Amino acid sequence: ANKEKLFGLAHNQPKVKEAPVTLILVGNKNGWDNNNPVWDEMLKSVGGNQQMVDGAKQAAAFLYGSSDERKLKFAESNTGLLAMSIMMAAMEYGVDSHPMSGLDFEGIHKAFELSENETVVMAIALGYYDKNQNLYPRRPRRQFDDIASII
């Protein structure tokens, strides 16, 4: 039922149904706040130095929680890094992945009853490439030097 629901919200992209697993990656806009268990882990790792942890919490509150834009950027960037890690791990195990951003983000948010602090970032289809299927040829990619400057 969830796969069918996602299929429609992914604009009927066949890979949603064809892949054995499709993940919806959701970012937590409040993942930086005091409720994150990472602060307890940090306290242990710094030998119980509460002052150091409090300083890190204050920095996080400013850097990631001082505006709606910063909260959204925090959630999206961390979830994007997680997505890349998932795809790299999948590749290591011989599993193919296909990230998808052509989604009805608001529809997914409602259909899967996400909270106000959660934001849909992307979906990833995971499975095995069907060698009998013809794919579109890969389009040319721009070179690093064409899109980036080292400063």
Regions found by a protein language model. Give the residues of each.
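Acidic, surface-exposed loops and disordered segments
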Residues: 1-151
